[in-house]
Amino acid sequence: MLDVDTARRRIVDLTDAVRAFCTAHDDGLCNVFVPHATAGVAIIETGAGSDEDLVDTLVRLLPRDDRYRHAHGSYGHGADHLLPAFVAPSVTVPVSGGQPLLGTWQSIVLVDLNQDNPRRSVRLSFVEG
């Protein structure tokens, strides 16, 4: 289980941690899962503006205001609970020879727009095969 600080970042790159986890395995599937109702996991390009573009797009799609029936927590918190409908809580990546088979520009990231929860858990699991 990874413990991730999201207090200052909305997108956190998990790729290095996933690569390190996969080195203990050979061939199979690595699943990256966030057991939270207001966060997700994505495979995107980072460092070229795509991560900021994703956050900007999600903020436009899910504005923090009083339109939501789910109204506990901070103002607009209902939007946070809709995030996993757009960014799933898990991704599965094929692994060969202990290496995740990601494309050149692909990174595995935690997406968390909910500033009420500054710590997240991320579960890594592996299915041999």
Swiss-Prot record:
Pfam families: UPF0047 (PF01894). Disulfide bonds: none annotated. It comes from the Bacteria. InterPro entries: UPF0047_YjbQ-like, YjbQ-like_sf. Belongs to the UPF0047 family. This is UPF0047 protein Mb2586c. It comes from Mycobacterium bovis (strain ATCC BAA-935 / AF2122/97).
